[in-house]
């Protein structure tokens, strides 16, 4: 195996992201999430560890399915309170040079015209280190609070997202020509008006004449992430995504998703290798196996079953408080689900516990056997999870030639796909909008 493994830190601008209850752990600093220094320190730590990116999750609603109430989520800080992730990026970019930032933003609630400007602005300010994790959202409470009168079904949300990205692509890729900005001081011409174009988009969901408000940024289009593993989500990923955050924690599940999405990508004329696949991973590492187990046991003491049941309810729509332990949801009994939720076992992602060698072995195995390209690293305590990984696992991966020793120059897209590849490839669907002046 010669390819380098890509590593992102999986974070959220809140107290309780995934490991619910652990905000109480004495080594956890997640209560500092409202302190900008917390985020700049974290960004510098991740860059020290040669991480590819900080992947920022987000929700714009409350988990209120469990017990038909928001109280459990609010009481236990299950992704609430939660602040806007976009506001963090400029400060973190200022104190780093190479670390990229993948930010989650929903296509369901806000207009693409304004969003396109925000992403272009961040791409300028980060010098091409921005990515967008495209989500369609799923929480009914978000629909209510954004005043959505006609609730879109799951697949129609992806129809809207398709058009949303089409609008953004037109603005980013085609509205301004590469040489539109000339900065001619003598003739008082900053931008050549003939090289700035309307997009004249008219669709089912959006009417956007254009032009884009921003001059071309280093990447133009941010690196596109996607994380939905439904049938429709995988189709969307095959069409749009450059990076996919996969569900699953075993080789069989991950390999199925990898092969399926890459096969679908060929239908759109895309090179399947132009899509990087990321799996979630939870790592508890120690210099010895016993030390790692001590950490796991320490985390388990603060693990909250109620918090995870609230999260499960919001994510699946099932209120387990209504069921007996002998009832079944699909092929799994409710008792089994609750038992699984009570244990710190990775839940949705692979859990790796042990020495640096054991963790590196398991990561390498998943990359080689499932065909993935990297991982989103979940944290249990902040910044301890990342510190341990950087100090113990990174040197082991570097020793095997599986992880960068230093960064290469360039944008985030170039760091993923090679020097010179700062724009979307020609086989991406967005490329058709580059000569928009001759297409509209």
From Swiss-Prot:
Shows particular potential to be used for the treatment of environmental oil pollutions and in other biocatalytic processes. Random- and site-directed mutagenesis were used to generate mutants with increased activity toward hexadecane. GO terms for molecular function: monooxygenase activity; nucleotide binding; oxidoreductase activity, acting on paired donors, with incorporation or reduction of molecular oxygen. One of its GO terms (cellular component) is extracellular region. Induction: 120-fold increase in transcription when crude oil is used as a sole carbon source instead of sucrose. Changing residue 63 to F: Loss of activity. Can still form dimers. CDD domains: Nitrilotriacetate_monoxgenase. It is found in: Secreted. SUPFAM superfamilies: Bacterial luciferase-like (SSF51679). Its EC number is 1.14.14.28. Changing residue 146 to R: 2.5-fold increase in activity toward hexadecane. Changing residue 14 to A: Loss of activity. Prevents dimerization. It catalyses: a long-chain alkane + FMNH2 + O2 = a long chain fatty alcohol + FMN + H2O + H(+). InterPro entries: Diverse_substr_monoxygenases, Luciferase-like_dom, Luciferase-like_sf, NTA_MOA. FMN binds at residues 58, 137-138, 158, 227-230. Involved in the degradation of long-chain alkanes. Converts alkanes ranging from C(15) to C(36) into their corresponding primary alcohols. Homodimer. Belongs to the NtaA/SnaA/DszA monooxygenase family. This is Long-chain alkane monooxygenase. The lineage of its organism: Bacteria, Bacillati, Bacillota, Bacilli, Bacillales.
């Amino acid at each position: 195996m010669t390819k380098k493994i890509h590593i992102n830190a999986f974070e959220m601008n809140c107290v309780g992201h995934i490991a619910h209850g652990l905000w109480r752990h004495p080594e956890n600093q997640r209560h500092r999430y409202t302190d900008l220094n917390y985020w700049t320190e974290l960004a510098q730590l991740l860059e020290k560890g040669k991480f590819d990116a900080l992947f920022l999750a987000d929700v714009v609603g409350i988990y209120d399915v469990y017990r038909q109430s928001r109280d459990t989520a609010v009481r236990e800080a299950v992704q609430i309170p939660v602040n806007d992730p976009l506001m963090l990026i400029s400060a973190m970019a200022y104190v780093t040079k190479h670390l990229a930032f993948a930010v989650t933003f929903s296509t369901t609630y806000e207009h693409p015209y304004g969003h396109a400007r925000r992403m272009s602005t961040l791409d300028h300010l980060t010098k091409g280190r921005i990515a967008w994790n495209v989500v369609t959202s799923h929480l009914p409470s978000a629909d209510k609070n954004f005043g959505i009168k006609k609730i879109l079904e799951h697949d129609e949300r992806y129809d809207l997202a398709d058009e949303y990205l089409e609008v953004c692509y037109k603005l980013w890729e085609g509205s301004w020509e590469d040489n539109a900005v000339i900065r001619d001081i003598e003739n008082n011409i900053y931008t050549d008006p003939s090289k700035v174009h309307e997009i004249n988009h008219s669709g089912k969901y959006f009417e956007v004449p254009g032009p884009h408000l921003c001059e071309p940024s280093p990447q133009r289009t941010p690196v596109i992430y996607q994380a939905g593993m439904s049938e429709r989500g995988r189709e969307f990923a095959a069409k749009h995504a450059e990076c996919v955050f996969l569900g699953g924690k075993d080789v069989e599940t991950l390999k199925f998703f990898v092969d399926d999405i890459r096969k679908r990508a060929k239908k759109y004329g895309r090179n399947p290798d132009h899509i990087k696949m990321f799996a979630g991973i939870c790592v508890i590492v120690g210099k010895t196996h016993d030390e790692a187990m001590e950490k796991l046991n320490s985390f388990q003491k603060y693990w909250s079953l109620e918090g995870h049941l609230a999260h499960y309810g919001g994510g699946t729509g099932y209120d387990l408080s209504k069921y007996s332990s002998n009832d079944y949801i699909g092929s799994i009994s409710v008792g089994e689900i609750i038992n699984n939720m009570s244990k710190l076992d990775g839940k949705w992602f692979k859990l790796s516990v042990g020495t640096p060698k054991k963790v590196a072995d398991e990561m390498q195995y998943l990359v080689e056997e499932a065909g993935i390209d990297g991982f989103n690293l979940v944290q249990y305590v902040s910044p301890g999870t990342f510190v341990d990984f950087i100090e113990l696992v990174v040197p082991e991966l570097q020793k095997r030639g599986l992880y960068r020793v230093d960064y290469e120059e360039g944008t985030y897209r170039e760091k993923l796909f090679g020097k010179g590849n700062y724009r979307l490839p020609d086989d991406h669907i967005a490329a058709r909008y580059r000569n928009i002046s001759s297409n509209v």
